[in-house]
Amino acid sequence: MHRPPLPLVLLLLCCRAQAGEIIGGTESKPHSRPYMAYLEIVTSQEKQVACGGFLIRRDFVLTAAHCAGRSVTVTLGAHNIQKKEDTWQRLEVIKQFPYPKYEPVGVHDIMLLKLKEKANLTLAVGTLPLPPHVTFIRPGRMCQVAGWGRTGVKEPASSTLQEVKLRLMEPRACRHFRAFDHNLQLCVGNPQSTKSAFKGDSGGPLLCAGVAQGIVSYGLSSAKPPAVFTRISPYRPWIDEVLKEN
């Protein structure tokens, strides 16, 4: 039976950033993931939503295409997104580059964000390496995801960065997602486990051996794993082209 997928953005309630956690994860050590970016987005319908992302160059953040909006503000160097620290760098996005063939709740869910100013690289703010174009990471690997998404479907929000280890699954585990494409996407999270990415985690990185291999894309509204992540390696030529031209 086909079940509708759910983009993993988080609606911001009462005009404030009320982000939560990854389901089944633990709180990250503060500033142990200096590449993490918290995105505050105003949509074309004037709604405020949140996504994750990650710094790949001092002036570029990589995220999911469904996190596009009328305006985007990026916070770097954050741990507790509701408690401002000296480590914070808040930067405006001046241009959004969603992949040209992006299909909502489908494939090509990847986007580059050009920052108005270059981030200052510090102990709390740094870049994350990307895989080469030829990389094809296979099922069975254990990887890590981090984000400020909810702890559960009905759980109260938390504000600190969370992380969880998730297994890369065989493509058949994502067969209930009609648009799933194993060549362009990753099936992430053991169906027998409760650990998963959820609302607010969209756009965050999947780390395998310290390299960003995927981007949180969509999952079931029940939060039951697995979820679908965009593979990064097939898009390296496009990423490199955008970075070179900007």
From Swiss-Prot:
The active site is at residues 66, 109, 202. One of its GO terms (molecular function) is serine-type endopeptidase activity. The keyword Iron does not apply. Disulfide bonds join 51-67, 143-208, 174-187. Keywords: Disulfide bond, Glycoprotein, Hydrolase, Protease, Secreted, Serine protease, Signal, Zymogen. Belongs to the peptidase S1 family. Granzyme subfamily. This is Mast cell protease 2. It comes from Ovis aries.
